[in-house]
Regions:
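Short conserved AdoMet
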Residues: 42, 64, 124, 138
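Conserved class I S-adenosyl-L-methionine
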Residues: 1-43
Length: 143
């Protein structure tokens, strides 16, 4: 199932990246999400994992706010686009191709926050994902 989902997003990666580029160039959209992340995350720098990062919109904003971000996506082509966007927007974000359900590369209690915008519906086993996400959060961490 993971492979089918990955293939679909790989096929649609160009269109999805075009949409994200429009969002990143729209000051109102960037301002809205910047305010929302400030409100949700607070002023202290956090270790954040973005699951299903796509071309990197939320990771770019979180990194601009001073957070230490790792972004993962299941599509190799999307990961390439996210890396390009990080360079284009001068952000230091670790980006990896990784299964967002099993998180095979993540250690227990590693993150303060897990972000996921528009990706939960694509998970092939959401219950398993949420259990795993909880395991990689530090005590008191938030999804």
């Amino acid at each position: 199932m993971f492979e089918k989902i990955e293939n679909k997003w790989t096929e649609d990666s160009g269109d999805y990246d075009d949409m994200i580029q429009k969002q990143l160039s729209n000051k109102r959209t960037v301002s809205y999400w910047t305010k929302e992340l400030k409100r949700l995350l607070g002023p202290e720098p956090l270790r954040i994992l973005e699951v299903g990062c796509g071309p990197g919109f939320m990771s770019i904003i979180a990194a601009r706010l001073g957070h230490d971000v790792k972004a993962i996506d299941g599509s190799s082509r999307i990961v390439e686009k996210a890396r390009r966007n990080m360079r284009q927007y001068h952000q230091q974000v670790e980006i990896c191709e990784e299964d967002g359900v099993t998180l095979p590369l993540e250690q227990e209690q590693s993150y303060d926050v897990i972000l996921s915008r528009d990706a939960v519906w694509t998970l092939y086993d959401p219950e398993k994902a949420f259990r795993r996400w909880k395991a990689v959060l530090k005590p008191g961490g938030r999804i």
